[in-house]
Structures are given as structure tokens and as C-alpha cells.
């Protein structure tokens, strides 16, 4: 982090590896249990020599390929917009960045510039999670291509998004018993807050009639890792052939 704060690195794609871009590696941690080992492996071989003065080419290529926003800019443009639920939650206005900046206005564990300057391991530098930032148009070459910066900012300021959910309607549809619903909730999912899931599916929530499969056997990548098993479980719960406490 100290090296990148003082000397951002040019990447083979033409983008720039800054300290803030490096912290976006945190996004991969919830993708699969094996990603923790992969991240540890690449970080242990990041420098060419023990003096931590020069990055290996393999590390720089890894950083280029592990964060695929250049190949998938629509993910960057619409990541926050998919949560814009009508005029109640519009515009998105770079909400993750706004929340981060609010956190670091005073000394905070979230301030990577502060924690990276400390010698003590008691205040480790924290990775970012599944979020996007306006500065990505500067660090990722394709995200800041012709017209892309203006497009990203215009989407962040868009105020006329339609409604995503009708909580009352969902509650009514599930309440009459003709429509059945089942859902998986991963206890250790770093992308989806467990308590919010319990609020939505609990008593009084719009999905209170949903049968809930709560497990810590999987992370966010459950469908990718064991999709057929999870689908069979949920289908059985919804159809009544598999009984669960919920």
C-alpha cells in the first residue's frame, strides 16, 4: 500500500494500479472460498525482490485480469443503479463513495491512507467490498473511454428510476398460499447482510411466507459452487417435499 500510494503503477492494459484500485481486490473474497488462498498466493509474490521496491510483471498482469471492469463496463455503470427503487432511492449519486468519504472525514479504520502509514498491525488496512467509485474512470482505461465518464456520472444522477419492488403486493401474493417461495440465505455472505435478510423474511416482512434455507456451507458463490444441490433443496422446500424449520 505504501508503495502504491507513493508510486502508482502502469498496467499492461494502459490502466493505473493505484492504492485504491488495489483495495478493490476485496471484491473477490466473497466470490468463492478458494479466492482467499489465491489472494494470499499472489500477494506473497508481488515484489521482485525482498526490498519491496519493484513489482513483478506477473503481479501487475494479475491485477489487470482480476478486476475485469475494462471488459465489463456495464457492471461498473449499473452496479448502483440496479438498487435505485423509484424516487425513494434515487439518484444513487455514487452512494458507496459518499458513504466512504463520510467515514474518513475523521480518523477511521476505513481510511486506507491513514492505516497504511501506521507501523502497528493493530490497525490493518481494509479492502473494499462489492462497490464502485467515480474514480474508476481514471484508474481503468476502458471505464474512462470516450463518453464513458459522462455516462457513468449521468446514471449516478438519474432521478426517474422505476420501482423495483412492491412489498405489499409480494406479501399479498405469498399470503394467499397459491404462490410458493423458497430462498437461500448464506450466513457468511460478505456481500448480502444476514440481518437484513432476516428482516425481509421474518415476521411482518414482505417475504415472511418464504421458506428460508439458512446455511454457512456456502458463501455468495453458492450457486456457482453447488448450484444443482441448492436448487434441488429450494425446489423441494417450495414444493413441500423437503421440510425445514422455517
Q: What would you call each of these model-derived segments?
A:
Residues 7-162:
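Alpha/beta-hydrolase fold active-site neighborhood
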Residues 32-33, 188-191:
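Acidic catalytic loop of the alpha/beta-hydrolase fold
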Residues 183, 201, 208-213:
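C-terminal structured domains
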Residues 191, 212-232, 242-245:
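Catalytic histidine-centered segment of alpha/beta-hydrolase-like enzymes
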Residues 1-5:
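A catalytic-pocket lid/entrance helix-loop region that shapes and gates access to the active site
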Residues 199-206, 236-237:
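Short, surface-exposed basic-aromatic patches at helix termini and helix-loop junctions that form
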Residues 42-43, 193-202:
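Short alpha-helix in the alpha/beta-hydrolase fold that links the catalytic acid
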Amino acid at each position: 500500500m505504501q508503495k502504491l500510494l507513493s508510486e502508482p503503477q502502469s498496467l499492461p492494459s494502459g490502466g493505473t494500479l493505484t492504492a485504491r484500485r488495489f483495495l478493490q481486490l476485496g471484491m473477490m473474497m466473497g466470490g468463492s472460498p478458494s479466492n482467499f488462498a489465491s489472494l494470499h498466493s499472489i500477494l506473497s509474490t508481488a515484489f521482485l525482490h525482498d526490498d519491496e521496491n519493484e513489482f513483478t510483471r506477473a503481479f501487475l498482469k494479475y491485477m489487470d485480469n482480476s478486476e475485469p471492469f475494462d471488459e465489463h463496463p456495464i457492471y461498473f455503470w449499473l452496479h448502483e443503479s440496479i438498487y435505485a427503487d423509484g424516487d425513494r432511492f434515487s439518484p444513487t449519486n455514487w452512494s458507496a463513495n459518499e458513504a466512504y468519504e463520510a467515514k474518513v472525514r475523521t480518523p477511521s479504520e476505513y481510511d486506507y491512507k491513514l492505516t497504511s502509514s501506521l507501523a502497528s498491525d493493530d490497525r490493518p488496512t481494509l479492502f473494499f467490498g462489492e462497490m464502485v467509485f467515480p474514480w474508476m474512470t481514471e484508474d481503468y482505461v476502458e471505464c474512462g473511454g470516450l463518453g464513458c465518464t459522462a455516462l457513468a456520472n449521468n446514471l449516478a444522477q438519474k432521478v426517474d428510476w422505476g420501482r423495483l419492488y412492491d412489498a405489499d403486493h409480494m406479501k399479498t401474493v405469498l399470503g394467499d398460499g397459491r404462490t410458493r417461495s423458497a430462498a437461500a440465505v448464506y450466513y457468511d455472505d460478505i456481500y448480502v447482510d444476514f440481518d437484513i435478510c432476516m428482516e425481509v423474511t421474518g415476521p411482518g416482512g414482505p417475504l415472511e411466507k418464504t421458506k428460508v434455507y439458512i446455511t454457512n456451507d456456502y458463501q455468495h458463490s453458492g450457486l456457482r459452487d453447488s448450484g444443482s444441490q441448492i436448487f434441488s433443496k429450494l425446489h423441494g422446500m417450495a414444493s413441500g417435499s423437503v421440510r425445514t424449520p422455517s
